[in-house]
């Protein structure tokens, strides 16, 4: 049995603070402070703090990562590309988790999962470099059987399944097909002994079905929480998301009762 398997009732929320930094950088100010947002999110029930240090530093910057690392009380999940610069930073900072993601400068946000099959040697080397530095590695991948198998073969103990196509589905039938791909991917990851997380594009009205899947350990959500906070406040936005996730998981385990 994998060390990472948890009880079916447990589901964690990783709050992504990237778009707090986006708001700050829109006017070149020192506020809102993403580090302050991270600490407040922890107080409101977040189980981890996720942040993506992109090569172009469009939102999170190096100082955010360095300032947050000694102050985080839960876990820091640093998303980064498979490049020498980013791997060196991750090995220096030593977050609790490093999630390797694909990255293109032209994209508004991450558009798909990391192609582990096509870049296997580079990804495997990155996993070893991070593991040697004491950092747990996660791979952000599409819910594809070949990618999941390749992720396992790299030695990474965690995968995060890309839920963007589910979130962006144009109709209910397409969304159901994407949900079934995710559910199958969760089962495949669990069967290989991997910890399975998920995220991308999830919000307050589409997260329920994903949170109900008992094999998922953690959901990473950011933009929706930042947007909802405009209306209800940051603390409430975090608490509401966590409550929705937990309620969906409990209802699924008890047959909707």
Swiss-Prot record:
Recall the GO molecular function terms of this protein's record.
Answer: pyridoxine 5'-phosphate synthase activity
InterPro entries found in the cross-reference section: Aldolase_TIM, PyrdxlP_synth_PdxJ, Pyridoxine-5'_phos_synth
List positions binding 3-amino-2-oxopropyl phosphate.
Answer: 16, 27, 201, 222-223
Residue(s) at site: Transition state stabilizer: 160
Q: Which stretches are annotated as coiled coil?
A: none
Q: Which residues form the active site?
A: 52 (proton acceptor), 79 (proton acceptor), 200 (proton donor)
Return the protein name. Answer: Pyridoxine 5'-phosphate synthase
Q: Which organism is it from?
A: Burkholderia mallei (strain ATCC 23344)
The beginning of the lineage is: Bacteria, Pseudomonadati, Pseudomonadota, Betaproteobacteria, Burkholderiales
This protein's gene is called pdxJ
């Amino acid at each position: 049995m994998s060390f990472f398997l948890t009880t079916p009732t447990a589901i964690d929320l990783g709050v992504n603070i990237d778009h707090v930094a986006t708001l700050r950088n829109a006017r070149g100010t020192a506020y809102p402070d993403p580090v302050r947002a991270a600490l407040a999110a922890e107080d409101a029930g977040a189980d981890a703090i996720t942040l993506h240090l992109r090569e172009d530093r469009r939102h999170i910057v190096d100082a955010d990562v360095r300032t947050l690392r000694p102050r985080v009380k839960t876990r820091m999940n640093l998303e980064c590309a498979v490049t020498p610069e980013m791997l060196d930073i991750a090995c220096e900072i030593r977050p609790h988790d490093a999630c390797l993601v694909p990255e293109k400068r032209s994209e508004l946000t991450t558009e798909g999962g990391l192609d582990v099959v096509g870049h296997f040697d580079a990804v495997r080397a990155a996993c070893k470099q991070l593991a040697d530095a004491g950092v747990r590695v996660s791979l952000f991948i599409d819910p594809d059987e070949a990618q999941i198998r390749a992720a396992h073969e790299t030695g990474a103990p965690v995968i995060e399944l890309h839920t963007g196509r589910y979130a962006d589905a144009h109709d209910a039938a397409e969304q159901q097909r994407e949900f079934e791909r995710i559910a199958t991917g969760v089962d495949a990851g669990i069967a290989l002994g991997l910890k399975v997380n998920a995220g991308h594009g999830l919000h307050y009205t589409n997260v329920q079905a994903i949170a109900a899947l008992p094999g998922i350990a953690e959901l990473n959500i950011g933009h929706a929480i930042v947007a909802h906070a405009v209306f209800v406040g940051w603390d409430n936005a975090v608490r509401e998301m966590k409550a929705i996730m937990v309620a969906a998981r409990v209802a699924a385990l008890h047959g909707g009762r």
